[in-house]
Amino acid sequence: MTITKLAWRDLVPDTDSYQEIFAQPHLIDENDPLFSDTQPRLQFALEQLLHTRASSSFMLAKAPEESEYLNLIADAARTLQSDAGQLVGGHYEVSGHTIRLRHAVSADDNFATLTQVVAADWVEAEQLFGCLRQFNGDITLQPGLVHQANGGILIISLRTLLAQPLLWMRLKNIVNRERFDWVAFDESRPLPVSVPSMPLKLKVILVGERESLADFQEMEPELSEQAIYSEF
């Protein structure tokens, strides 16, 4: 028996020959399997959530809490949206310390959006709910992800809400009341002006792995039981 000693380089895969292929963008082939074929259970759950008479405004999806998976779910939801592109929201008019709200008449209005699906794997309070800023006496209102998802769907990782339970409590309140109220993030520093609340309606998909789902179900047993459930 002949024993041949190999150098470590002989054991390294030859990737140089395939660099040109790796550099090419991935093109979806018309023969690629559809999402409904590969994930029929998840597809059905999304159809239930998007139904006008859905049993719940919340959906729990067991999947890795990574942006790639959240975006895949978002893409699937977009294909099912029958009202995509519908103008919703409003416009805040700020005059000194007086703020008024009117209905949106254009997508350029500061709190208007076209119904869509918004996904986020990690957010802070200002990113999710927007904020009020004051500089040299001038007041500006900044919309958050909930305003972008108004009339549509917000997809968010459970770990974000489990790590920041106050975010979850406020998000749940917004969904249940279908209204957004402006509140200070720090109770010791109240808002300098009164801001009218605005109608806000959205559905939420909470994405988490087994441990996150178990923790959430322990925290929200009733909502977890009522929510639409599926797995990726």
Regions found by a protein language model. Name each.
Residues 1-218, 222, 228-232:
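Conserved ASCE/P-loop NTPase catalytic core
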